[in-house]
């Protein structure tokens, strides 16, 4: 993955011009739910992954209502870009205001087929970026920030080695692992088991 994304990065950086800096918050944790929740749901996702989009469309709302909004669990979103467009989309989302991040990625998932298959994906992503509060100047600054690109790529490689993550979406919940498209019942069983292990059932 490193070589492929690195070659793409060089081409894309040349396209957006001289290097500038992304906002300092671009690499901070992105999470939903209370910081002190007893259970952490780690989601590893690629923004061009159709099964990831299905999770956000069909299942996340149920998890949010049952566990995140009740302070029983916290969902931490980890970028795991599987292709060049997913990497660019991840950078774009992280450069927006942190409080709008999950709204931003929900739009990216809902409109995934449109922007990922567009003849000009940069223009398609820029349109979404502007809806999320980014200027074109900030959009270009983020895409030309080699440090941000390297950091996202390195994080994905690190978790791939540490947790043997090879596909998306992958979820780690306590000692349980969920891969691919799964129904809410499967997440409920894993979260309830983790709550029981934490003495919070």
Name each model feature, range by range.
Residues 2-82, 153-162, 193-201:
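Extracytoplasmic thiol/disulfide redox context detector
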